[in-house]
Amino acid sequence: KICTNAGGMNINGCVDGIRQWAEGNSMSGYKIGYVTGDNIKDKIPQLLKDGWTFPNFDYDGNFNDILDKIYNCNVYIGHEGIEGCLAEGADVVITGRAADSALFLAPLKYEFGWAADDWDNLARGIMAGHLLECGGQGAGGNYMYDWRNVPRMDELGFPIAELTDDTFEITKAPDCGGIICEQSCKEQFLYEVHDPANYLTPDVNVDISHATITQVGDNRVRIGGVKGKPRPDTLKLCVGYHKGWKTVSMLSFAWPDAYEKAQYCAEVIMKKMQRRGMKADDIHISYIGLNSLHLGVADMSEEALKNLNECVLRIAVFSEDKSECAKIIPEISPLQLNGPPGASFFGGRARVQEVMALWPTTVPRDAVQVESHILETNY
C-alpha cells in the first residue's frame, strides 16, 4: 500500500492519473483512496465574519490586506482521512497538504488499533514518521556531522522504522548506501522542531525533551522516551497570495580582481537604474561564492577577496509594479562589453517573475472537515 500527499493542490488530477495508469495496466478493482478538506479557501469569508483574524506567524500584518490577492488556502491535516481510506480497503491513498508525518501515523494507528487519545503511541508514530518523512535525509543525506564518511551516497537508501511496544528502531536495507547512526538520527529528529517539549502536529503535541537515541547495532538506532500530549485546537494554515514581481539578474566575472569588478558593475547598473527612474520596493545585491548565503556574517576580508578565481554578481529587484522590474533587463546584457572586463552571462537573460508569498497562520480545527473517498477502477 502507498500513502502520499502527492495530490498537492490538484487531488482530482492525481487520482485521475492513477486511475488511467491502473486501468491501462488491466488492474480492475484497484482501490484509489483520496482525502479532501485541506483546501478551505471558500471558508475564509465566514471565518472572518466569525472573528478569526488569521494572525501571521512571521510578522505583524492585517489579513484583510491580502484578501483580494489570495491564490490558495491549504491546511496541514492529520491522519484521520488517510486512516479512513485504509479502513475502506484502499490500495493507495492520495492527500493534499497532509502533514508528512501523518502519512506514517495513519497506517500505524490503523494496523495497531491505537485509540484516538492514546497520546504516547500517537507521538511515537509521529516521530517514527518524522525520521522517515524526508527519505534519504534520514539515512545520511544532508548529513552535516560526518558527511564525508557516508558510505555509497550515490546509492543512498531510505530509513525504515520498526515499532515495539514502547520504543522503535530505525534501520535501512542492507544492500543500500547511507548510514543510520545516533548523530544522523539526531539531526533528523530535531529537524523543524522549535520546542522539543511541544512539537505541535495536527495529531498530537509531541514531547521529545527526554527522548533517548541509542545505537544498538550496525545501521540500527533505538528511539525511546517519546511522550505525547493532547493535540492542539488549531491547525496550521498556509495561504499563498500575490505579493508582486521580481527580476533576478546575474553576471559572472573572472580573475583577476573578480570581486572588485563585480562590485563596480553593480554600481554601474544602479546608476543606470537611477537615470531610468526605477522605483523598486526592494533591491538586493549579493555575490555568489562570497555572501549570497551568509549575507552580513560572510568573510569579506581582503584576504578572502584578493585571490578569487571568479565571482558572480546577483541583483534582485522587487516591486509591486511589474513594469519597474522590467527596467533592469535590457541593461544587463550590454555590460558584457560595456562594463568591467571579464564579464559573461550567468543563467541566461533575466525575466520578470511573479512573487507568490506565504502567509503562515492557524485556523480552528472544527472549521476543517476532512473526508475520505474511494474510487475503484473498472477495467
Report each predicted region and the residues it spans.
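Flexible, glycine/charged-enriched surface loops at secondary-structure junctions
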Residues: S28-I32, G138-M153, P196-Q215, K272-I288, ...
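An acidic, phosphate/nucleotide-engaging active-site surface
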Residues: K41-T95
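Gly/Ser/Thr-rich loops at beta-strand to alpha-helix junctions
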Residues: A6-V15, R97-L103, S319-K322
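A conserved active-site cap/scaffold subdomain adjacent to cofactor or substrate pockets
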Residues: D120-P230, K246, M250
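Hydrophobic or amphipathic alpha-helical targeting/insertion segments
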Residues: K1-I32
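Short glycine-rich or small-residue beta-strand-to-loop segments that form or flank ligand, phosphate
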Residues: K1-G8, V93, V312-S319
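C-terminal non-catalytic interaction/assembly regions of soluble proteins
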Residues: G224-Y379
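Catalytic or ion-translocation cores adjacent to nucleophile or general acid/base/metal-coordination motifs
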Residues: Q20-I40, L105-D146
